[in-house]
């Protein structure tokens, strides 16, 4: 069973700039933005998350690589993409993560797509799934019972990031194509809970 989350109005707040180092034009968000182009920005190159957790996307329409953005300062692309294999130097769309709940997050991982094969129940951060006993470097599918998670391609939270939430797809991610428009493989080797 997937637990539904409650979205509280005004819980998310983020300020973005079109130049690195918090310089240039500035805009504040309290809700999703499918394209900064509509605001007259070409891109976002620095940002500060003041409250809530967000997902930043490389392209408009919530497409391309995705990056979890938790409370803090991101003076340049290396602050949000420094651990990824192919960092995006800009972000052009954003949305809040409604179900982030670090204390009450539960995730089931499956060996094969469509929730088949061996499974593992997670409720903590795992910098290496292999170290916790998971065989191989791939996860076929996920079921998010509660909370929100960021899954990474390589151990130590490196490589491509995939954001999984209990309030998207009813918490069911049957195939890597549902992890994001940039997902091209079942390779996932580390997972962690997203913090508000």
From Swiss-Prot:
Region: Connecting peptide, residue numbers:
99-104
Q: Which SMART domains match?
A: XTALbg
Alphabetized, the UniProt keywords read:
Acetylation, Eye lens protein, Repeat
Which residue ranges does the record annotate as region N-terminal arm? 2-11
Which GO terms are recorded in the biological process aspect for this UniProt protein? camera-type eye development; visual perception
Q: Which SUPFAM superfamilies match?
A: gamma-Crystallin-like
The answer to whether keyword tRNA-binding applies is no
Per the record, residues carrying N-acetylthreonine are 2
The protein's matches in InterPro entries, at most eight in alphabetical order, are given as: Beta/Gamma-Crystallin, Beta/gamma_crystallin, G_crystallin-like
Q: Which residues form the Beta/gamma crystallin 'Greek key' domain?
A: 12-51, 52-98, 105-146, 147-195
Molecular function GO terms recorded:
identical protein binding; structural constituent of eye lens
Q: Name one Pfam family in it.
A: Crystall
Q: Partners and quaternary state?
A: Homo/heterodimer, or complexes of higher-order. The structure of beta-crystallin oligomers seems to be stabilized through interactions between the N-terminal arms.
Per the entry, what this protein does is: Crystallins are the dominant structural components of the vertebrate eye lens.
Similarity field: Belongs to the beta/gamma-crystallin family.
What does the entry note on its domains?
A: Has a two-domain beta-structure, folded into four very similar Greek key motifs.
Record-linked PANTHER family:
BETA-CRYSTALLIN A4, BETA/GAMMA CRYSTALLIN
| Protein name from the UniProt record | Beta-crystallin A4
Gene name, per UniProt, is Cryba4
């Amino acid at each position: 069973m997937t637990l539904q989350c409650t979205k509280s109005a005004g819980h998310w707040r983020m300020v973005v700039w079109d130049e690195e180092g918090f310089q240039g034009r500035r805009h504040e968000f309290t809700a999703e933005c499918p394209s900064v182009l509509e605001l007259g920005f070409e891109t976002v190159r620095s940002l500060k998350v003041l409250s809530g957790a967000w997902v930043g996307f490389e392209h408009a329409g919530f497409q391309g690589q995705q990056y979890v953005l938790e409370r803090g300062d991101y003076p340049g692309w290396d602050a949000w993409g420094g651990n990824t294999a192919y960092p995006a130097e800009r972000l052009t769309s954003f949305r809040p993560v409604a179900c982030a709940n670090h204390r009450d997050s539960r995730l089931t991982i499956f060996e094969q797509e469509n929730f088949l094969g061996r499974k593992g129940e997670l409720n903590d951060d795992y910098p290496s799934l292999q170290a916790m006993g998971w065989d191989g470097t791939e996860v076929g599918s996920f079921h998010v019972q509660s909370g929100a998670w960021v899954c990474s391609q390589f151990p130590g939270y490196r490589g491509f990031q995939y954001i999984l939430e209990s309030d998207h797809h009813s918490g069911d991610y049957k195939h890597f194509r549902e992890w994001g428009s940039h997902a091209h493989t079942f390779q996932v080797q580390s997972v962690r809970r997203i913090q508000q």
